[in-house]
Amino acid sequence: MAKKRANGEGNIRKRKDGRWEGRYTAGYDEKTGKRLIKNVLGKTQAEVKEKLAKAVAEAETVDVRRADEYTLGTWLQTWYELYAKPHLRFSTAEYYRRGIELHIMPRIGDIPLKKLSGRDLQWLYKDLQEHGRLREAQKGKQPGLSDSTIRGIHTMLHNALDRAVKERLIVRNPADDCVPPKIPKHEMKILPPEQIKSYLTAAEQRGVLPMFYLELISGLRKGELVALQWTDLDIENKTISVSKQAGRNNAGEPDITRPKTENSIRKISIPQDAVDLLVAEHQKHPSNPWMFPSPKTDQMYHPDSVVNIHKKILKDTGLEHLRFHDLRHTFATLALQNGVDVKTVSSMLGHFDAGFTLRAYTHVTRQMQERAAEKMGNFMAQVM
């Protein structure tokens, strides 16, 4: 049945108890066609008139009958099953599910969706910061969740409530009013150029030189690196095709998945030395489809296993702590410092655009600008 308009400004009357009441048509039952009558109360006629005008305007925007069906918890469950889970990677979907079931439902899940406020969400974030960790007995761990985890919960809530606005369940998104924690930026570290040789020597002694050499000259993400197969190597054109990464399927089992974005699907040019190393590696296990199979299973390495090998290499050489992801930063930094243009580096990294790369590596581009300024200064000194 077509939606009927709300009942103008509604009707206002004074009740026997002295209060003023305003009644209005909030909508119509889809099955019976009967009007859904709502009311507002106040001490004065002016107060009720103001409330009534707001309620009538809201009734034009919100599907009141459906809005009354949901608490925050039941809406999040509906949103997760219909809009999130079918379109997200398994790991992201699990992250959302745990956030809903473990952190949101026990605290504010019973709040009616239409009454949820930005302050309710802000109190949620505060509580999670102070008492959110479920396993408080973990050594060295604070009782609260990390800022990055809370920020992720905020992003999820914002998306779910945006959907509620689109479905006319609420007038506006209360998450718009929130101030989620800021995520502290990790200090960007790189493997110093003078230590690269000792790092690769240690990798060679552990039998993983081709893998880590390729990492340093390509900046692949760890999931992309372990998912490489021999069919991804083009010997003649000296390229590596990146079209997949290690992930988990819908059953939570290790599997090969597509990268998160289309920009991550790319071809990377590699030097002849890298091609030679990879060909020699292939000759050690010519029938295995994986470029870097695990010696224990002959299957694809788990990304965490590669991180553990990286830590052992650092320990072997006495180098300072460095995340595996910092090898990616090492590639990007050294490429920029050695004159590779930002657009090329961006495409090799699989970034969305060169602007993101510029922002991520501001410290390097600043040095490049200083060198450019010095060169121009020298040039102008010669012509003056």
Residue ranges and their predicted role:
Residues K182, I190, A246-R248, D298, ...:
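Catalytic-site neighborhood detector that most strongly recognizes the C-terminal catalytic loop/helix
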Residues G22, L121, L157, L161, ...:
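Short, basic/aromatic-rich helical patch in the C-terminal catalytic core of site-specific tyrosine
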